[in-house]
Curated annotation (Swiss-Prot):
Keywords: Coiled coil, Cytoplasm, GTPase activation, Phosphoprotein
InterPro entries, sorted: AH/BAR_dom_sf, F_BAR, Rho_GTPase_activation_prot, RhoGAP_dom
Domain Rho-GAP: 425-622
Chief localization: cytoplasm
Listed SMART domains: RhoGAP
Native source organism of the sequence: Schizosaccharomyces pombe (strain 972 / ATCC 24843)
Gene3D superfamilies reported in the protein's UniProt record: Arfaptin homology (AH) domain/BAR domain, Rho GTPase activation protein
Phosphoprotein as UniProt keyword: yes
UniProt name for this protein: Probable Rho-GTPase-activating protein 9
Taxonomic classification: Eukaryota, Fungi, Dikarya, Ascomycota, Taphrinomycotina
Length: 670
């Protein structure tokens, strides 16, 4: 199935896709030159043949004058007639050459020059836009480099939405009004403590951790700071824990209770001397409630929180502004490139149609002027009329294909040690998308029943809509909690296809696909080996094995989407071709290649095949699936791409339908 230029020439760096599209266009320009040269040769040969015939007949007539009055014999008259026919043929050759130049060659040559200028202007403007984006990216990257010594980095940017933090806290089961209160017992590694008992334990823990004031450039001074390595040993001795796994568990429980926070992007406690931790306001208030304190003076409450302090720091404000400009530039660039690819596609289609017209016209003129060769030109004419411009373009696209559209993520602006440099896709925004997906699916499910046109209903997910409309609707949806009322208010402006497209954009903006990109080569090997219908059990076993490794959040979203698409496909009685088209559109959300893969091979159809199996075999795959439990504190980590392979899944060997060694051993991420 062919998607045209707009979904075939995307790359992570943008410029590679543009260069491939330009290479295709340049091959078309070379084809124009080749055709013009051939037509020039034909016209020149016709004129040369005419000149040669006239010159030769003049010499013949000088030595053997032919006069109708002397044609007494029938044979002389026949020879004279032959001479006249040759003269007529010479004049026809001359006229053919002139007509080819006037009616075919010159117009096509002028059109080719305009075509070359047209595509050059389109590509040049796109390259200027890309260079502008790259310069902005370098500017932001240089600002990031100037802040590399700054720790901690804020874990999220201030959201434009006033209640977004409350939304995130609600998903983490944290009530802001009760954030500094303890009700009942405090359990740490299955040991219950009363609030007073735990206050004394917490004081010992602070002293053992050697907490101190620490200064961070551009952020100021912070009290009660220690590194995770010292804190690890302090927890081990204070709570009397022997196993390191219990120490890690205790540290994570302290984080969940809001007594400790890790400074940076980390959300899971571990024995790492490079990561700093801070005892929070809640822990200090717990000590004060029992007249305990580790600080002689209590300046802690006057220290700005790193999240809110960011907004008052001039250096970080400049970084915020530069980052916002970069994201705005990226947004505009992707919209512009869609238009560029559409223009290039139309230009190439116009060129192929022009070539077809030139070939047909040339055959028409040649056949009319030279009756003796008319049968040959008729055959050529029939062949030229059957030329399929779209098929030629599809072949060229497959030859130069770079990949389908995936919005570029600027997650690389974070440092190598994973400290977050004001990353745009923060935990709060990701949680908004997580809550947004089921609401949109529920609205669509209700909207299907009101659509009476079956043809429109069957194309809700596959109809192409302007990318700008989808971006605008996505922005509106992410700023509201009442999705249904917003969609009802926008029903006249946005179609159901715009809603589905905006939903796909939300999913594409996740740092990783719903099935982690580390499984990309694994599924490629699966669908390269098990291609027959008889291999369905092998594929389903491999898919289910992968699903067991997913975090609960992306697994829940994946299940909701596949359940919706499966019911949608059944309700409108989708055929295999329609399901394949639907799967190809949704596949980048489900499984996409790793970030280091700049060009996606056109042969990589396994994400589409995977989605087809998920839709067709939904009940078999998700019915008895054991969901892994993901603690609320790990939601951000669940939505963050990983570079390490998941641990090997321990399943009974007898449950596998594969009797022979699996061909995916080298790709298997388990």
């Amino acid at each position: 199935m062919w998607d045209g230029f707009s979904n075939s020439f995307w790359s992570r760096d943008y410029i590679t896709g543009i260069n491939r599209a330009q290479r295709l266009i340049n091959e078309g320009v070379e084809q124009n030159e080749k055709l013009l040269q051939l037509l020039h040769i034909r016209a020149k040969s016709a004129s040369s043949c005419s000149d040669l015939l006239f010159k030769s007949f003049s010499k013949f007539n000088k030595h053997h004058p032919l006069n109708e009055e002397s044609n007494d014999l029938p044979s002389d008259a026949a020879i004279h007639q032959l001479y006249e026919s040759y003269l007529m043929e010479a004049s026809l050759h001359k006229k053919l050459g002139e007509q080819l130049n006037i009616l075919v060659i010159n117009p096509f040559a002028n059109w080719s020059k305009k075509y070359s200028r047209r595509v050059d202007e389109i590509v040049s403007a796109a390259i200027v836009k890309i260079n502008n984006y790259n310069s902005r990216f370098s500017h932001v990257n240089s600002k990031k480099s100037n802040l590399t010594d700054r720790k901690p980095i804020p874990t999220s940017r201030k959201s434009n939405k006033s209640d977004s933090l409350a939304s995130a806290l609600s998903q983490l089961d944290i009530n802001p009004s009760n954030v500094n209160k303890f009700d009942g017992l405090i359990n740490i590694v299955d040991h219950p403590y009363t609030a007073e008992e735990f206050a004394n334990v917490l004081l010992k823990l602070m002293k053992a951790s050697t907490v101190k004031r620490k200064s961070y450039s551009h952020l100021g001074d912070y009290e009660l700071v220690t590194n995770c390595s010292l804190l690890f040993e302090a927890i081990k001795t204070t709570f009397g824990l022997e196993k390191d796994s219990y120490v890690v568990k205790a540290g994570n429980q302290l984080i969940q209770h809001g007594l400790i926070r890790l400074l940076g992007i980390r959300r899971v406690f571990e024995n790492d001397p490079e990561i700093d931790a801070q005892f929070t306001t809640k822990s200090q208030q717990l000590l004060k409630s029992y007249h305990l304190s580790i600080l002689e003076v209590d300046p802690y409450f006057q220290v700005n929180d790193p999240i809110t302090a960011t907004n008052d720091d001039p250096v970080l404000q400049k970084y915020n502004l530069a980052y916002d400009n970069l994201e705005q530039c990226r947004h505009e660039l992707e919209l512009y490139l869609f238009m560029v690819f559409k223009d290039l596609e139309q230009a190439e289609l116009d060129r192929l149609n022009a070539v077809k017209s030139v070939l047909v016209e040339c055959s028409n003129y040649s056949g009319n002027f030279i009756p003796s060769l008319n049968s040959i030109f008729i055959d050529n004419l029939n062949s030229f009329k059957n030329l399929d411009s779209l098929r030629d373009m599809s072949t060229q696209i497959n030859k130069h294909y770079t990949g389908y559209f995936i919005p570029v993520s600027n997650n690389e602006l974070s440092t190598k040690d994973e400290y977050l440099f004001l990353q745009k896709s923060s935990l709060t925004e990701d949680n908004l998308i997580v809550s947004l997906v089921p609401k949109i699916l529920a609205y669509l499910l209700d909207a299907y029943s009101y659509e009476r046109d079956e043809e429109v209903l069957s194309c809700v997910w596959t109809t192409e809509v302007p990318l700008k409309d989808a971006f605008d609707l996505k922005s509106v949806l992410r700023k509201t909690d009442n999705v249904e009322s917003v969609l009802n208010a926008c029903v006249e402006k946005y179609t159901l296809s715009s809603i589905t497209c905006s939903l796909r954009l939300c999913l594409l903006e996740f740092p990783d696909s719903l099935i982690r990109s580390s499984f990309y080569d694994y599924f490629k090997a699966i669908y390269t080996t098990y291609t027959d219908f008889e291999d369905l059990d092998h594929r389903l076993y491999s898919i289910k094995k992968c699903l067991l490794h997913l975090h609960s959040t992306p697994l829940h979203i994946l299940e909701e989407i596949i359940r919706h698409l499966s019911a949608y496909a059944i309700s409108i009685r989708m055929k295999d071709g329609q399901i394949r088209h639907l799967a190809k559109i949704i596949s980048p959300c489900v499984l996409r290649p790793p970030d280091d893969l700049n060009i996606i091979p056109v042969e990589d159809t396994h994400p589409t095949l995977l989605v087809i199996d998920l839709i067709n075999e939904f009940e078999n795959l998700f019915a008895d699936l054991e969901r892994p439990s993901t603690p609320p504190v790990e939601i951000e980590r669940a939505l963050t791409p990983i570079t390490t392979s998941p641990q090997k899944l321990k399943l009974p060997r007898s449950s596998s339908p594969c009797k022979n060694p699996s061909p995916t051993r080298r790709f298997r991420p388990f």
